[in-house]
């Protein structure tokens, strides 16, 4: 299982939000590139980046810093946040981003997702943000009536290989992940599942690894030193 340290970027700073609320911002570092180097130097295999301004349709604010990370860090990065059209996908991939994460358009335009998957294959990842089993869109501001497991199956059908699944009610709350939903997705699909939201302790990491998930994104717990990155990384490399 891959541990993805999360770098959430808002106004060119590394921050964390609580439950996706933009008025609950905690700034951890002024320079996200510095943070990317930190995780790389600690042995990260992959870095997960979210453009929070992009998620709220404030485009271009963090473009340069994301390009700087892609060009300076020689490990793969995946980037999401407000990616809703072909041009944005193309510009991120041209900027050196390894995988692009699509969010709201998976609900709003499944045909476009299929087109992008046909063109970019495994470089396209879909992020499913859910609350009480229903998919949330537009930077978590709107909860739809689409069932998250049903969406997972539809995505698998059109060729998506990897998803990031976030339980919004758990994100940034340090309460532990929603293990049940990960188990169901793993059981009912063959998608590579990256768990996100609420990974709080080394016990959570052990449990997710035991479920044979593809990866886990950890943000707040790393920055608040609830989880030691190297310990989590070692744990995930055991038995592989």
UniProtKB/Swiss-Prot annotation:
It is found in: Cytoplasm. It catalyses: 1-(5-phospho-beta-D-ribosyl)-5-[(5-phospho-beta-D-ribosylamino)methylideneamino]imidazole-4-carboxamide = 5-[(5-phospho-1-deoxy-D-ribulos-1-ylimino)methylamino]-1-(5-phospho-beta-D-ribosyl)imidazole-4-carboxamide. One of its GO terms (cellular component) is cytoplasm. One of its GO terms (biological process) is L-histidine biosynthetic process. One of its GO terms (molecular function) is 1-(5-phosphoribosyl)-5-[(5-phosphoribosylamino)methylideneamino]imidazole-4-carboxamide isomerase activity. It holds the Pfam family His_biosynth. The active site is at 8 (proton acceptor), 129 (proton donor). SUPFAM superfamilies: Ribulose-phoshate binding barrel. It comes from the Bacteria. Its main location: cytoplasm. Keywords: Amino-acid biosynthesis, Cytoplasm, Histidine biosynthesis, Isomerase. Its EC number is 5.3.1.16. Pathway: Amino-acid biosynthesis; L-histidine biosynthesis; L-histidine from 5-phospho-alpha-D-ribose 1-diphosphate: step 4/9. It is an enzyme of class 5 (isomerase). HAMAP family: HisA (MF_01014). Belongs to the HisA/HisF family. This is 1-(5-phosphoribosyl)-5-[(5-phosphoribosylamino)methylideneamino] imidazole-4-carboxamide isomerase. It comes from Clostridioides difficile (strain 630). The lineage of its organism: Bacteria, Bacillati, Bacillota, Clostridia, Peptostreptococcales. The gene is hisA.
């Amino acid at each position: 299982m891959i541990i993805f340290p999360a770098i959430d970027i808002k106004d060119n700073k590394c921050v964390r939000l609580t439950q996706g609320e933009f008025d609950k911002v905690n700034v951890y570092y002024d320079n996200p590139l510095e943070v990317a180097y930190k995780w790389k130097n600690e042995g990260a295999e992959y870095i997960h980046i979210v453009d929070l301004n992009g998620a709220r349709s404030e485009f271009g604010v963090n473009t340069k810093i994301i390009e700087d990370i892609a060009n300076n860090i020689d490990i793969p990065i995946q980037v999401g946040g407000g990616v809703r059209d072909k041009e944005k996908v193309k510009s991120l991939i041209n900027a050196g981003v390894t995988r692009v994460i699509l969010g709201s358009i998976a609900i709003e335009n499944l045909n476009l997702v299929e087109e992008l998957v046909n063109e970019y294959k495994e470089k396209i990842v879909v992020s499913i943000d859910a609350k009480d089993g229903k998919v949330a869109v537009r930077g978590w501001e709107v909860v739809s009536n689409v069932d998250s497991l049903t969406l997972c199956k539809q995505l698998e059908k059109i060729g998506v290989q990897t998803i990031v699944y976030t339980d919004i009610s758990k994100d940034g709350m340090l309460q532990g992940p929603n293990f049940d939903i990960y188990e169901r997705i793993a059981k009912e699909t063959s998608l590579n599942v990256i768990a996100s939201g609420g990974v709080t302790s080394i016990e959570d990491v052990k449990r997710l690894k035991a479920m044979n998930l593809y990866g886990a994104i950890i943000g707040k717990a790393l920055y608040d030193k609830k989880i030691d990155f190297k310990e989590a990384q070692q744990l995930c490399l055991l038995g592989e």
